[in-house]
Amino acid sequence: KLTCYVIYASERIERLSHFLQCASDSHVVPISAVTKEQVSLLGHSSALFNLKRAEELLERTPNDKEIAHTLSHIQCWKAIAENEQLQNNDFALIAEGEIQPVENFIQHAINYANKYSSYGIIKLQRDGKTPACERLYQASDEPDALIYGDTNQYNYGCSLYLIRKDVAKKLTALLSETKPYWLADQFTAFHEPQNIAQARYLLGENPSPKQQDKVENPLFSIIVPIYNVERYLEQCIES
């Protein structure tokens, strides 16, 4: 079974319902999102982030919401790196709870992982314009990935992607020596562009603002966060 780490906001727990139903054929590990309030409570985001390098990369200062978003994804990498059930060359799926996946997306994700197993990260979603005619996966499609000439094209969206355990371990080791300085979707800032694949046929999309207002019946019984966010932030500061 594919292991899927899903990031959810505790105040929007009901949004997970649809995703969990769609991912019933995988092993789902809920990860409670770091919030901008938790970051701002520390009073000094430099305790969690390398602001100087981030400003050089972004040409501006990242805000607390962006820092929290990045730390939420790093929390998933840490969980993957520590998962003894996964082999180093196994992929795990990272998803943001509000993603709207296509039908049978878990099986399609497995197919992408099998076909592009030499890549460390396989992006299954994309934000913004699609320069290479990327579109949602349809029943007759085969897994097909793109290699962009303009490597910045990899840095649009991080709501759904596969990451190999050895990459998660490498990133976790890096973060024990340095604080993060990238945003969650700036993949080329923390991983080699030539080792990233972008799905041409996307396995999910983010809801429009109108769709976000729609609330489904929550499945509270299976939302069990495995990580204590406060302790995780303390570890980030200590590292």
Which positions does each model-derived feature cover?
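An acidic/histidine-cluster motif and surrounding catalytic segment
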Residues: 1-95, 99-214
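Alpha-helical interaction/dimerization surfaces of two-component signaling modules
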Residues: 22, 236-239
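A conserved hydrophobic helix/loop-capping motif in glycosyltransferases and polysaccharide synthases
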Residues: 3-11, 220-229, 236
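Short N-terminal helix/helix-N-cap motif within the alpha/beta-hydrolase-1
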Residues: 103-104, 231-234
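Terminal low-complexity segments of carbohydrate-biosynthetic enzymes
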Residues: 216-218
